[in-house]
Amino acid sequence: MGGHDPLVLMCLPEAIEEFLSCLRARKLSPHTVSGYESDLRIVGEIAAGLAGVAVDGLEVRHLNGRLIRGAFAVFSDPRSAASINRAWSAWNRLLTFCVSEGMLEGNPMAAVPRPKQPVKAPKPLLGDGTASAELLERIAAGARKARDPWVERDLVVLGLALVTGMRSAELLGVTLGSIGGSAGDRRIQVVGKGGKTRSLPIEPPIEFLIERYLDSRLRRFGLTALPRSAALLVDTANEPLQRGGLQYLVRQCYRYAGIHDRVQKGTLVHALRHEFATRLAERGASAHELMELLGHSSIVTGQAYVASTAREVRRAAQGNPAYGVLDRLGAGGGDG
């Protein structure tokens, strides 16, 4: 009467495939799913070797703390803390899934230590804080030379990144229907990491530039209207802008604006996100406000959560110095 239900018998590769199918159904990015798959399969093969069986013969019910800990010890030796933590997270999610599906009685990942990872220092644009203003002003003046120049579009790309702190994938995922709210209280609904959504406030200067860009888009392609499902950011063929195109555009803007030497190594579009957060922090935005705006899941250890309302988050965003530049550009931009 008090006995446990028998465990569902399944080999590890089959369980991994079922887990990955669930991730795909939840619309996680292909890049994220691919990273999970690689880490799960590599550690799984190590675990099978330690157990003395082929990976196809390793049943999920035999995964225990000692075996997984041993597999991670082998896996960790040549790898960085970031890689180990990523694999740890992948396995923790897999084994939590296996428990929920009745393949395991409990998740053994508590027995597997994970390395402490130093918090990475932000990498905003170098200099005295004027680089973003120079970037916007020079691009607005037509500094970027291209076969098919489109200043209105370029300004919206840079402006949105600087006043919202969106990641590359988030910028590319914005549609016309993502923008809502009434005048003076506009917001962009963003789908971030892990499919989490957040609402980002935008102010009249960027609203005006978006409207001007959309008008130019209609004229450029001979259109009378755009559906709400249309991507906000497009290339010169009116196709949704892709990651490579976005990176190229931003790199070219840095170059022609003469600030490429102020972009730190390992950043490109992400430098604009770091610039956004750094300048707001300088103007007194709290850690919790920045966490909400950036879409982070936690605050750096040691910082207390600060109660924050939607109005306070908007006020923090309004302090972004990029808005002052965009306001001037919009006021003097005419129809160009």
Enumerate the predicted regions with their spans.
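Conserved catalytic core of the tyrosine transesterase superfamily
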Residues: 1-336
